[in-house]
């Protein structure tokens, strides 16, 4: 399965959740599959989807146990193996902050798909073992879970999902919004 099909599969479960998507082709593919105001399409900042997702999750997490629309939304981050390897410090920060509304999904194709499919070191590293070593309690291989059930359950911790995919980019169109339009539409919807 390639990333396009993986994103399509996951987006069938997404209703009101906020989605932050990695740069380049992943964002283009998400845009083609299911464009909506609650999708934040990253443009030009490789490695930072997990950090942006963490910031949103911390802002929306329930701090005092109350649940309302403004602070209990789940944040789903679509990231890539190359981006996670560029910013591995974000994994330690996510673990230590542990927002209980963050789901980080790493599409691992073993390459930098948006820059020409150069190999990443993820081919030699077990990312699930890395996050377990950091201390994540809820980390899964996508093939071993029912994502719909994961999404429905009340989280006790941040969740890490490793999604092994084949290299390849869909022939998805360029996003026809400027960065300012993406930001403004997103913020208007989530605030």
Specify the residue positions occupied by each region the protein language model found:
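Thiamine diphosphate
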Residues: 3-8, 32-64, 69-185
């Amino acid at each position: 399965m390639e990333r396009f099909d993986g994103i399509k599969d996951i987006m069938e479960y997404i209703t009101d959740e906020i989605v932050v998507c990695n740069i380049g082709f992943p964002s283009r593919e998400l845009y083609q599959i299911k464009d909506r105001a609650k999708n934040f399409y990253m443009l030009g900042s490789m490695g930072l989807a997990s950090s942006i997702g963490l910031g949103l999750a911390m802002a929306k997490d329930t701090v005092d146990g109350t649940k309302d629309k403004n602070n209990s939304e789940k944040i789903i981050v679509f990231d890539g193996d190359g981006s996670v390897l560029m910013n591995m410090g974000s994994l330690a920060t996510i673990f230590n902050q542990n927002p209980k509304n963050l789901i980080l999904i790493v599409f691992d194709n073993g390459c930098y798909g948006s820059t020409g499919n150069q190999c990443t070191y993820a081919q030699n590293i077990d990312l699930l073992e890395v996050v377990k070593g950091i201390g994540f309690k809820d980390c899964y291989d996508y093939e071993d879970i029912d994502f719909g059930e994961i999404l429905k359950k009340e989280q006790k911790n941040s969740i890490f999902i490793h999604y092994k995919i084949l290299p390849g980019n869909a022939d998805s169109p360029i996003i026809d919004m400027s960065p300012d339009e993406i930001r403004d539409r997103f913020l208007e919807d989530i605030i």
